[in-house]
Curated annotation (Swiss-Prot):
Protein name (Swiss-Prot/TrEMBL): Bombesin receptor subtype-3
Lineage of origin: Eukaryota, Metazoa, Chordata, Craniata, Vertebrata
Protein localization: Cell membrane
Assigned GO CC terms: plasma membrane
Cytoplasmic side: 64-82, 144-163, 242-272, 334-399
Listed InterPro entries: Bombesin_rcpt_3, Bombsn_rcpt-like, GPCR_Rhodpsn, GPCR_Rhodpsn_7TM
PROSITE patterns per the UniProt record, alphabetical: G_PROTEIN_RECEP_F1_1, G_PROTEIN_RECEP_F1_2
Sugar-bearing residue positions: 10, 18, 29
Known function: Role in sperm cell division, maturation, or function. This receptor mediates its action by association with G proteins that activate a phosphatidylinositol-calcium second messenger system.
Disulfide bond entries: 120-203
Organism: Ovis aries
Length: 399
């Protein structure tokens, strides 16, 4: 394919091609880490480390999310309102791990975009849809947990499961609608680094020359997929923590042993939620800051410095890692899921669930998944945190 030459030595060449495509900027396309950049490209040792890291993320993430989904569908007691959202989150993570993460590895293997114009648009759509499903599901989960804390005695209607499935479906539809413009405008562009006199193709949402569009796009991504949902989640869980703390002050020390254990459990859960919020912010903040940096700094040429390359790799690994940690956070925090996980992983009979799980005190509805249509004293063992899709422990578990 013929390429136009730059008009001046310092001008970046950008030309739309017919056989390449763009990637979602929520996980910015890495156009600077190719081996073509010469001296600042990763060495053999670094490339091996990158390949191994990606392989671990893909294999561990697929295994964990697949088991989580299987446990949900095979275990009736796990089919609670919060676990529907968790399973939806697992589907979104699995979609990302099966498509976009393997494609991202090719940035370090090939000299340019390999998947054509259609592939670029499809992958951009999938990537942004998955990110939207994750972020918006976590936000809805935070609202669900807040409601459970404020109204622990409220009985869920018999059609709660159906309504929750509808909500999860709406999240997917909304995420796809938001991702649609990304797929429409994404394309493959040819870039030139005038300092090294090399050209390469990359999938991008907008041409580098469209400075204003990049700035608007990066700000919108930062607000819609990070600042706004994280702010909402932070408000909900600040209120949850405050409610849990105040409730512990109102229970006399002479209460029965069971109530005292419940108080300690609620304190541990409040602390765990704060940690999960920090983990969520940590995984996504570098990625968004990197895209903002690329959009608002000089773009007359691609930054191929070693520091920029290192930050890019780390930010992408952190973002993709968020899709594989949820099942293992759930394994760590939920004794019942741990038993089912082991049963599926090692093909053995799952251990008998803790009988106290079906008779948990009403106060623990704040962090327990209530069984729709059941008496108010009946509830499932699983409870969730919205940031990793993981369950919070039963009162006899330890955080």
């Amino acid at each position: 394919m013929s390429q136009r030459q730059p008009q001046s030595p310092n001008q970046t060449l950008i030309s739309t091609t017919n056989d390449t495509e763009s990637s979602s900027s929520v996980v910015p396309n890495d156009s600077t880490n190719k081996r073509r950049t010469g001296d600042n490209s990763p060495g053999i040792e670094a490339l091996c480390a990158i390949y191994i890291t990606y392989a671990v993320i893909i294999s561990v993430g697929i295994l964990g999310n697949a088991i989580l989904i299987k446990v949900f569908f095979k275990t009736k007691s796990m089919q609670t309102v919060p676990n529907i959202f968790i399973t939806s989150l697992a589907f979104g993570d699995l979609l990302l791990l099966l498509t976009c993460v393997p494609v991202d590895v090719t940035h370090y293997l090939a000299e340019g975009w390999l998947f054509g114009r259609i592939g670029c648009k499809v992958l951009s759509f999938i990537r942004l849809t998955s990110v939207g499903v994750s972020v918006f599901t976590l936000t809805i989960l935070s609202a669900d947990r807040y409601k459970a804390v404020v109204k622990p005695l409220e009985r869920q209607p018999p059609n709660a499961i159906l309504k929750t499935c509808a909500k999860a479906g709406c999240i997917w539809i909304m995420s796809m609608i938001i991702a649609l413009p990304e797929a429409i405008f994404s394309n493959v562009y040819t870039f030139q680094d005038p300092d090294k006199n090399v050209t390469f193709k990359a999938c991008a949402s907008y041409p580098v020359s469209e400075r204003l569009l990049q700035e608007i796009h990066s700000l919108l991504c930062f607000l819609v997929f990070y600042i706004i949902p994280l702010s909402i989640i932070s408000v909900y869980y600040s209120l949850i923590a405050r409610t849990l703390y105040k409730s512990t002050l109102n229970i006399p020390t002479e209460e029965q042993r069971h109530a005292r254990k419940q108080i300690e459990s609620r304190k541990r859960i409040a602390k765990t939620v704060l940690v999960l919020v920090a983990l969520f912010a940590l995984c996504w903040l570098p990625n968004h800051l990197l895209y903002l940096y690329r959009s608002f700094t000089s773009q007359t040429y691609m930054d191929s410095s070693t520091v920029h390359l290192f930050v890019t790799i780390i930010s992408r690994i952190l973002a993709f890692s968020n899709s594989c940690v949820n099942p293992f956070a759930l394994y760590w925090l939920s004794n019942t899921f741990q038993q089912h996980f082991k049963a599926q992983l090692f093909c053995c009979k799952a251990g008998r669930p803790d009988p106290t799980a079906a008779n948990t005190p009403l106060d623990n509805l704040a962090v327990m998944g209530r069984v729709p249509g059941a008496a108010s004293t009946q509830m499932s063992e699983i409870s969730v945190s919205p940031f990793t899709g993981c369950s919070v422990k039963k009162e006899d578990d330890r955080v």
